[in-house]
Each structure stands twice: as structure tokens, then as C-alpha cells.
């Protein structure tokens, strides 16, 4: 009887350790899955930003062809696009682990969006430009890009929120802390003034 009791203690310890290990493993896997969802959505955000950037050379070339078009507007777009391009690819790729890089990238993209909005607003003063087929095609493509950007940013924020909520709950927060920067909190896109709704870029007036 005494010998049987002597086994109870070690067995109980083994069971407890096994349960803890299983819980830690399950929590780790859950954080990994949620983190991968954030990474995937971050890639989507970059893709739609790139799609917008690819439209800019043709847009600038088109408006430059309009007589007496205000050069400061398309020069501002070109400058803003260049600022985005100056951000090192590694900084963009690793921005989810560096809030400063994330904020810098988001700000540069917002400034590019603002410059485009100003250019398009000025374009309304040039009916002949707006009547061209190339400009109307760019209008449709740009509107689609802005809609996709707003949509993918929202999806990214949703994925980041799901990760952060899981990470910050107890005892998950303790487990996340065991792995250092592996499970850092994910940054969010912040709404900019006037960004509550997607701009309606429409030149067919």
C-alpha cells in the first residue's frame, strides 16, 4: 500500500506537466495561426497599394498632356510616390514587428492618397481631359484601387485585432511573453481625417 502511494506523487506531477504542456502547445499554435492570418492580410494590403502605385505613371502622363494643367499637382503625386518607394523593402516586410516602420509606411501611403485626391480634384477643371477614353479608364481603375485599399485595410485591422485580443487575454499573455518578440502586438491602421468613406472619384459629370 505504501509502495502504491509512492507512485501517486510522481504520476500526478507527470499528468500536471503534460496538461500544462498541452495547453501551452495549443495556445502557441493558436497564436501562430492568428499571426499567419495577419501576415497574409498584410501582404494583401501591400498588393493593393502597389496596384494603385502602378497606375500613377500613366495618370501623370495623361494629365501632363492637358494644356496648362497645374504642374504642382502631378509633381506632388510623383514626389509622394517616390517617398513610398524610398522605404526599404525589408522595413515594409518587417513593419508588423516595428510600430515605427509601420506608421512611416502608412503615413507615406496616406500622403500619396491625399496627393492623388488633390490632382483629381483639379482635373475637374479640365473637361476635355476628363472626356478622353484613357482618363476615364484610369478613373475606373483608380476608384477600384481605392475601394480595395479601404477593404483590405479593414480586413487587416480585423485580423490584427483578433490576434491582439487573443494575445492579451490571461493566461495567453504569459505564454506569449515566454517567446519574446515572436508574438509582439500587431499595429493597426489609424483612420485619417476624411477617411471614414472611400472617395468617389467620378469625372463623368
PLM region spans:
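A helix-centric hydrophobic-segment signal that preferentially recognizes long
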Residues: 1-205
Amino acid at each position: 500500500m505504501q509502495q502504491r502511494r509512492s507512485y501517486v506523487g510522481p504520476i500526478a506531477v507527470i499528468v500536471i506537466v503534460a496538461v500544462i504542456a498541452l495547453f501551452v502547445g495549443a495556445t502557441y499554435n493558436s497564436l501562430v495561426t492568428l499571426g499567419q492570418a495577419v501576415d497574409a492580410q498584410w501582404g494583401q494590403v501591400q498588393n493593393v497599394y502597389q496596384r494603385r502605385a502602378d497606375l500613377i505613371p500613366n495618370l501623370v502622363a495623361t494629365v501632363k498632356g492637358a494644356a496648362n494643367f497645374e504642374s504642382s499637382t502631378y509633381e506632388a503625386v510623383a514626389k509622394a510616390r517616390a517617398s513610398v518607394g524610398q522605404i526599404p523593402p525589408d522595413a515594409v516586410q518587417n513593419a508588423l514587428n516595428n510600430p515605427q516602420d509601420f506608421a512611416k509606411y502608412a503615413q507615406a501611403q496616406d500622403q500619396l492618397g491625399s496627393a492623388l485626391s488633390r490632382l483629381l480634384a483639379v482635373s475637374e477643371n479640365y473637361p476635355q481631359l476628363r472626356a478622353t477614353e484613357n482618363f476615364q479608364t484610369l478613373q475606373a481603375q483608380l476608384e477600384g484601387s481605392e475601394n480595395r485599399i479601404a477593404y483590405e485595410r479593414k480586413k487587416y485591422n480585423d485580423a490584427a485585432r483578433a490576434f491582439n485580443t487573443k494575445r492579451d487575454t490571461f493566461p495567453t499573455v504569459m505564454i506569449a511573453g515566454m517567446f519574446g518578440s515572436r508574438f509582439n502586438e500587431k499595429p493597426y491602421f489609424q483612420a485619417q481625417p476624411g477617411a471614414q468613406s472611400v472617395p468617389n472619384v467620378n469625372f463623368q459629370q
